[in-house]
Amino acid sequence: MTLLDTMVVVYARTPDSPFHQWAKEQIAGAVAGSGAAINAVTLAELCAEEGMEAAEVAHQIAGIGIEVFDVPASAAARCGEAYRNYRRQRKRESDKDSPKVPLPDFFIGAHAEIMGWELATNDPRRFQNYFSLKLVMP
């Protein structure tokens, strides 16, 4: 199974994106192979996009064969641990604070790691630094 980072789905729906073709190919390849998935965090991010109704987003996602999964409870502790490490490193390197609540990428990365899934992303920085998982990148 390939878990899709939110921006992979966004880029696949954005013809003028420099990652449009790559994103479409990743989704199509995953759907035809072991499966393509997003989680509830990604679904929320997609539904937050201006002008997008939740029913329309769900219809589009299902229409191209992407499965939607809840984030497993077992990923919560891993998400928190990775985000805590990120906050410490950010504070140490830049003396800047981060929000106390984990950013969406940490839920997505923890989910992929816990499930043993690969993760398709065009922005590997946080995933490489805080998780042990296979990344699919342009």
Say what each PLM segment does:
Residues M1-I38, C47-Q60:
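Short, well-structured N-terminal submotif of metal-dependent ribonuclease cores
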Residues M1, G109-P138:
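Acidic, PIN/NYN-like endoribonuclease modules and their adjacent C-terminal/linker elements
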Residues V8, T42, A75, I108, ...:
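Alpha-helix capping/helix-boundary segments
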Residues E53-V57, Y86-R88, V136-P138:
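Short, hinge-like loop/turn segments at secondary-structure boundaries
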Residues A62-I64, Y130-F131:
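Short, structured coil segments at secondary-structure junctions
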Residues T6, A40, P102-F106:
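Conserved glycosyltransferase catalytic-site signature
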